[in-house]
Every structure is written in structure tokens, then in C-alpha cells.
């Protein structure tokens, strides 16, 4: 191995061993017939070699009549027999250690700068067991779990028995974010799947159903692996910049064609970002019943911003050991536990004795003393200010506590403290929220804002009771709470479609003037429940007063065009949501899905009550939506698909009609229309569709010069079908309860769609520019004669992906 350790099994008549290595003088030693330890040191061979440049001829690879390809077809054909799911039941134990370290350290670096000034940093340095390089561990996380499976009816659950973490994540209140993201990015690998989910991407498995067309295979040798005869093959992607691996397969040379060992790496010219090196080693073992199962799954990844490592980097090591495979019937009560992942109540408080019993790989000396290292870090002068700034930047909030006295109140979001809009002008806002250190069940949040232009105060306050104890914020999964809120603020109709806060300073710059707004006074009671299966219910009661302002007026559809000062509604709504397998990272501002692989189904119905608490209208609105991501085979990228439909069943004025999901900022956002103006189309029946195709660089990777930039391409199309029935159309009805459509300077700014002509916009984008920037050109294909519209535009987004 990398440490020079070896083991050789001798046979009768063998009495000598010869040791050789490139650049060293060979040495022969005598050995006996008994077990013995032989340590050998080779002397360097100081021979100066002349430079030789080898330029291979371009390879002509053919799948036809290729023995390696024919052999791999048999491996793929037999792989179903090796998956655990062929058994009626199975269970196994799993131990995982995830370590993050600063890498690329050298003896020279350790004698300079901060390492020279603080000796405890040098004391924390160790040699990586996988790369043989100097590293400085900064985080270690251990997880002990048990997985159980039942075939009929199919059910699979993972029971987390213990979790243990030490390191820099202790400095962050949402420290579980690091562990959650690391586990998702460096996920478990099953080469028997067609695609391997890794780095939040999909890689083609070397034994996947599409592998023959994606990889080149080469037969190398027949050799013994763990006393079993195996066929050794190597594989490389047809195009090294596609999302695939290079590596070695060791397949049993018998009728099972089972994989006994697999090593995988990323190609040197890979299109993957931030990864300079990745080593994956999997070992399989045979059980007494003949099954071959995964025993070891180890991964080492070197990360840095650029490939030449001038900025330094990190190393992530994931060590995973599987044991105690069993195929006996399992107690049925375990399958009745809620959720696919069950966390034992004492998983965070397991004893040292417990970890010693389940830890199949001992901690290194530096890993064991991680808590001491963290304490020494805190003693560095000025370190707390560095952490304070880093937390404010990453979490977008400022804490009011300290390590000994955790924050009970956080100030933020920081990016909403100053913004601007047409009514407020320059707007200043101060926001805050209590945390679980204030109370595990009761939470408060709110803000106060002031606009220099309209000289009005705006405010919002919310009181929430969580039925579940929370660790830090109220929206941790699964949510179960009751809240009451009251707010008074200025809003545009499209603000409700934003995924982020409407006062985000980066959204202040619009592609067109948004001058049709309202002062909204809301009183809301909200109940929300989520289950571990991904099912959620949200029930809401809301009383709203809507006072138009700016260039927005409410004029009755009568001869006098009577001005309406405001509209009051009293409504109740119920939303059902189902997203099986969805997982989240908790930030202080909101929950963020770890990945977007889970399908999402929603159904909402809202009812308005005329005469209840001053409500002006009855209304009934129903909306449904489906969102799904589809990964294409053979590294052809992914398609995100969204379909929505809805209807307003009653006669209502235009503020209560259904608006398109418009986004008039320069920041692109999923599922919104970039070129539809504020309230441009008013419908009481609609259907919309969004398709986004991310090719992951499949085209650019085949264009000379361009492929060196590692740019990636994407295509998007969005469509909206809508209609307005005569009863809600002020141009076809004399009903005075309706309002005239909005105008600006005497010209209408809202329109009725032709039910036979959908609104369509498309975009072509390039992302991964400098590994950071997403640029998208958007074009409007229909309704191009509407006044005041943009027919095309450029949109941006900061996007970091592997």
C-alpha cells in the first residue's frame, strides 16, 4: 500500500524475494518457510534519464468482436442476481466516518505564516492513509445505522442508531447543514445501479445497462484476488469530460460474473468542478449462503477552487463498512415505524463504549482529539470575529449570543436591511427572530420597515407554537406548528411568486418599472403538518385588506367608473402536498431541498366568504401542480418538468383572478416567467408548463477549445394557456361588481388571453462560467404586440455546482 506495507504468501521451494521499484536499486533477500516480518530499504538509483516524449497513435476502438465488451455484456446480464432485493428480507449494519481536512500541506508551508505562529496547528497535522499526503483534519462525523428490507409488500428503512460529530461545524448554529450536505454530495455508491448519484450529479455506472455505449473496456489479465480467480478489466469514458469514471473491475471468473473489487477515479480531463482527485475503492465479500455483498466502500476526494491548487483545498474522506448481513424474517413492527429514516431518541448521546463497539475503523490520534483542537482554535486572538463574519455571510443572520450563551434572538436577514421599490423609494428594514434557545416550542419573528419616499412604516409580526421540539428554527423537518401573524406592507401582485424574501436587495433592480402595487394589511392563522412519509397539510385562515397605490386603481365596471378605495377578503384555504423522499438543509431564513430529485405534488383550494369580517366577495379557487426531475441515461443530463393548472369558479374582480407567475428581476428563478409583465394576463382558467433541459456540457464537451472552458448548456421553454370566462370579463359583462382592467396613462396594461394561443417563452443559457455564473438569453414567441413588453432579455444567476 501507500505506506510500503506488504504481505506475500510463499510456496514450497521459495526461499528468495526480490524487491524493485522505479528509481531504486533492486534487492534480493532470503526468506524462511515460517511467518516472518521482513523490512526492506531500497537505495536510490541515481541514474539521470534522458527526456523521452511518447505520442501514442489515435486509438481505434471497436465494440464489435471485442472480448472485453462481450465479457461485460455477461456481467451486466447477470447483475440482477447480485442485488440484495432478490431476497424476501435482508438487514445489515453500517458504520460511516466522514472526515474533512485541509490538504496540500507541505513541510515548507508548516514553517510559515499561521502554522509557524500557532504550533497546535502543526500538532493537528497527520498523514492521510489514502493519499500519503499531509493533511489537517478539521471535522469528523460518524454515523452508525441499520438497514432493513422487506420484499412483499416492499418496504425499506434505515434506523440511525448513533451520530457523533466534532469539528468546525460546532461554530455554526445550523451546523447539521455541513453533515447533511456532505452525505448528499458524497453519497453511498452502488455500482449495480444503472446510474450512480454522486456530487449531486448522475454518473454512468461501469456495469449499468447503458455502460457498453458509454465506456471503453479492456481485458487486462486473469489474477487471484482474495484467493479467488478474477478477470481484471479497465474502463474509461468515450469522452473524458462526460460524467463517468475511469477504473478497474475485478470480476469472478465463474458463472456468477460477480464483482469482487472495483476501483474508480475521475478522468484527468473531467468536466466535474472543484474535484482534483477522487479515489473510490469497493470490496465485496461472499456470505455463507453464496451471496456477494458490499463490505467496504471508501472514497477520498481532493477539492479546490482551481485545478492548479494555488488557493489550497480540502480533502474529504468517507469510510464505510458494512457488516452483519442477515436474510431472516424481520419483526413486522419495525416496518410500521413512520418514515424511511428513523432516528433513535438517544442517537446523539451514545457512550464511548458504544462507539468503540461499532467503530470498525479506529479513529486516528488527531481525529480523537478534535474537541481539543476546536478549543485551541477559539483561543486564537481575533478568531471569534472571523467566525462572526463568516456566520453572517453564510447564514445571512447576526447572532446575539456566544458559545457559552447560545443566541436566543438572531438579527436578519441581512440582505433585506436596505432595498428599494417604486412606492417606498429607498427602504430600510430591521428583522429578527427568536431561536429554540429562547424556547423549544414558542417562536417569534417580525420586522419593521420604513420607506423614505412614501414616509410610511411597515411591519410584520408572527407568533408560532411548534408541537415538536425544535433544535434551532421552527421550520425544521418535519413541521408541525400553529402560527398567528399580522402585517402591514406594500407589495406588488407578483411578490408572492418569489422563492426568497421580496426585500432581498438583489431583487431591487427590475427589468421594467413595477408601479402598480398595493398596501396590504393581513391577519393570518396558519396550521401546518408534515409527516415523515413526505405528506403535508397546510390550513390557513386569512383576513386581508388590499388598498391599491402607485399607478394601480380599482374602478368599478359601471358607467361612472366608481373608484374603490380598497378590497377586503376573508378566506380559508387547504393545501395538500406530497413529496416522497424529499430532504432538506435548514438555514436560518428557510429550508432548502438538498436535492431536487423528489417528485412534488400539490393541491390547493381557497374559499372566500362575503360578509364574514367585512369580506367583499365569495370566491373559490382550485390549483394543482406536479414537479418532477428526470435524469437521462448515458450522461445526457436532466430535464425538470413542471405542470400546473387552476380555476377561479366564482364571479370576482381582477385582483382575485389568477395571475401568471411573473419574475421581473434580472435574477432567474425556477418555474417563473421572465418576460410577462406584472398582471399582464388575467385568467380564471389556466394551465402552465415549464421544461428545462440541462445537458451538463454534453455539447460543449465535444467542441475544441470551448470544451476547455468547462461551460455547460441548458435550454428552457415555458408556456401558459389561459382564458377568462364572460362572467369575469369586464369587456363582455356589465356586472358592476367587476373592476375595469388596470391602465397606465390611459392604456390597458392587463389583457385577456386567446384560449387558442398560448403564451410561450424560451431561453438558451450557459452556466458554469468561471464555475460561478449562469447567463440566460430569454425570448418571447407570442403576444409580442402587447404594449410595454420586453420581447427578449438577459437573465443571471449565481450557481455553483460540481
Regions found by a protein language model. Name each.
Residues 247-253, 279-289:
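Extended lipid/amphipathic-ligand handling interfaces
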Residues 201-203, 327, 336-802:
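Exposed, low-structure sequence patches enriched in small/polar residues
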Residues 1-51:
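Periplasm-facing N-terminal accessory domains of Gram-negative outer-membrane beta-barrel systems
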Residues 264-270, 298-306, 486-487, 645-648:
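Short, solvent-exposed aromatic-acidic interface loops
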Residues 46, 58-230, 236-244, 306-419, ...:
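Structured extracytoplasmic
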Residues 273, 284-293, 303, 318, ...:
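Extended non-globular scaffold/tether segments
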Residues 89, 226-234, 258-263, 291-296, ...:
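Short, hydrophobic/aromatic-rich segments at coil-to-beta transitions
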Amino acid at each position: 500500500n501507500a505506506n510500503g506495507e506488504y504481505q506475500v504468501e510463499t510456496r514450497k521451494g521459495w526461499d528468495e524475494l526480490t524487491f524493485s521499484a522505479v528509481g531504486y536499486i533492486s534487492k534480493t533477500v532470503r526468506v524462511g518457510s515460517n511467518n516472518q516480518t521482513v523490512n526492506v530499504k531500497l537505495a536510490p538509483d541515481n541514474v539521470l534519464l534522458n527526456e523521452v516524449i511518447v505520442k501514442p497513435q489515435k486509438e481505434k476502438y471497436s465494440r464489435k468482436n471485442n472480448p472485453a465488451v462481450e465479457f461485460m455484456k455477461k456481467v451486466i446480464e447477470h447483475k440482477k442476481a447480485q442485488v440484495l432485493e432478490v431476497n424476501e428480507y435482508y438487514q445489515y449494519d453500517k458504520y460511516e466516518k466522514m472526515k474533512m481536512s485541509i490538504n496540500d500541506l507541505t513541510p515548507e508551508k508548516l514553517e510559515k505564516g499561521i502554522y509557524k505562529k500557532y504550533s497546535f496547528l502543526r500538532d493537528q497535522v497527520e498523514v492521510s492513509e489514502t493519499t500519503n499526503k499531509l493533511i489537517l483534519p478539521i471535522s469528523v462525523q460518524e454515523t452508525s445505522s441499520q438497514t432493513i428490507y422487506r420484499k412483499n409488500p416492499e418496504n425499506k428503512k434505515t434506523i440511525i442508531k448513533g451520530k457523533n460529530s466534532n469539528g468546525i461545524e460546532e461554530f455554526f448554529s445550523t451546523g447539521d447543514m455541513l453533515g447533511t450536505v456532505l452525505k448528499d454530495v458524497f453519497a453511498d455508491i452502488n455500482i449495480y445501479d444503472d446510474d450512480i448519484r454522486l456530487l449531486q450529479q448522475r454518473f454512468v455506472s461501469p456495469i449499468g445497462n447503458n455502460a457498453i455505449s458509454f465506456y471503453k473496456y479492456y481485458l487486462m489479465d486473469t489474477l487471484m484476488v482474495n484467493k479467488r480467480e478474477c478477470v481484471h478489466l479497465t474502463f474509461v469514458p468515450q469522452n473524458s469530460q462526460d460524467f463517468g469514471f475511469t477504473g478497474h473491475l475485478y470480476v469472478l471468473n465463474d458463472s456468477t460474473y460477480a464483482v469482487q473489487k472495483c476501483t474508480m477515479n475521475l478522468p484527468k480531463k473531467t468536466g466535474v468542478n472543484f474535484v482534483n482527485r477522487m479515489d473510490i475503492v469497493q470490496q465485496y465479500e461472499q456470505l455463507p449462503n453464496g451471496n456477494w455483498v458490499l463490505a467496504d466502500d471508501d472514497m477520498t476526494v481532493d477539492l479546490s477552487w482551481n485545478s492548479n491548487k494555488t488557493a489550497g483545498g480540502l480533502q474529504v474522506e468517507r469510510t464505510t463498512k458494512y457488516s452483519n448481513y442477515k436474510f431472516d424474517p424481520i419483526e413486522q413492527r419495525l416496518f410500521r415505524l413512520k418514515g424511511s429514516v428513523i432516528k433513535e431518541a438517544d442517537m446523539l448521546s451514545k457512550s464511548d463504549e458504544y462507539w468503540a463497539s461499532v467503530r470498525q475503523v479506529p479513529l486516528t490520534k488527531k481525529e480523537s482529539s478534535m474537541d481539543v483542537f476546536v478549543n485551541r482554535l477559539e483561543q486564537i486572538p481575533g478568531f471569534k470575529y472571523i467566525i462572526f463574519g463568516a456566520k453572517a455571510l453564510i447564514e445571512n443572520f447576526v447572532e446575539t449570543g456566544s458559545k457559552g450563551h447560545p443566541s436566543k434572538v438572531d438579527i436578519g436577514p441581512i440582505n433585506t436591511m436596505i432595498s428599494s421599490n417604486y412606492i417606498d423609494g429607498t427602504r430600510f428594514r430591521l428583522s429578527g427572530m427568536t431561536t429554540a434557545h429562547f424556547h423549544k416550542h414558542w417562536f417569534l419573528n417580525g420586522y419593521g420597515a420604513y420607506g423614505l419616499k412614501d414616509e410610511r412604516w411597515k411591519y410584520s409580526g408572527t407568533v408560532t407554537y411548534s408541537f415538536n421540539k425544535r433544535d434551532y428554527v421552527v421550520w425544521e423537518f418535519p413541521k408541525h406548528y400553529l402560527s398567528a401573524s399580522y402585517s402591514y406592507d406594500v407589495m406588488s401582485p407578483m411578490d408572492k411568486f418569489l422563492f426568497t424574501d421580496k426585500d432581498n436587495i438583489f431583487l431591487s433592480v427590475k427589468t421594467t418599472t413595477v408601479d402598480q402595487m398595493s398596501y396590504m394589511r393581513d391577519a393570518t392563522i396558519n396550521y401546518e403538518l408534515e409527516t415523515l412519509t413526505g405528506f403535508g397539510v397546510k390550513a390557513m385562515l386569512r383576513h386581508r385588506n388590499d388598498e391599491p397605490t402607485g399607478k394601480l386603481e380599482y374602478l368599478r365596471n359601471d358607467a361612472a367608473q366608481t373608484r374603490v378605495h380598497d378590497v377586503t377578503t376573508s378566506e380559508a384555504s387547504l393545501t395538500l402536498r406530497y413529496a416522497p423522499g424529499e430532504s432538506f438543509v435548514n438555514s436560518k431564513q428557510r429550508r432548502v431541498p438538498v436535492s431536487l430529485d423528489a417528485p412534488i405534488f400539490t393541491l390547493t383550494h381557497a374559499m372566500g366568504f362575503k360578509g364574514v369580517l367585512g369580506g367583499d366577495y365569495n370566491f373559490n379557487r382550485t390549483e394543482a401542480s406536479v414537479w418532477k426531475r428526470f435524469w437521462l441515461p448515458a450522461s445526457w443530463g436532466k430535464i425538470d418538468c413542471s405542470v400546473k393548472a387552476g380555476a377561479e369558479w366564482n364571479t370576482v374582480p381582477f385582483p382575485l383572478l389568477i395571475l401568471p407567475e411573473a419574475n421581473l428581476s434580472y435574477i432567474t428563478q425556477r418555474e417563473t416567467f421572465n418576460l410577462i409583465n406584472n398582471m399582464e394576463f388575467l385568467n380564471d382558467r389556466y394551465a402552465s408548463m415549464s421544461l428545462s433541459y440541462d445537458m451538463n456540457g454534453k455539447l460543449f464537451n465535444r467542441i475544441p477549445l470551448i470544451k476547455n472552458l468547462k461551460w455547460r448548456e441548458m435550454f428552457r421553454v415555458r408556456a401558459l394557456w389561459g382564458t377568462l370566462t364572460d362572467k369575469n370579463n369586464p369587456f363582455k359583462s356589465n356586472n358592476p361588481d367587476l373592476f375595469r382592467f388596470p391602465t397606465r396613462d390611459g392604456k390597458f396594461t392587463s389583457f385577456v388571453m386567446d384560449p387558442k394561443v398560448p403564451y410561450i417563452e424560451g431561453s438558451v443559457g450557459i452556466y458554469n462560467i468561471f464555475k460561478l455564473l449562469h447567463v440566460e438569453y430569454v425570448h418571447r414567441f407570442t403576444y409580442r404586440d402587447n404594449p410595454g413588453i420586453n420581447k427578449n432579455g438577459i437573465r443571471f444567476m449565481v450557481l455553483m455546482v460540481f
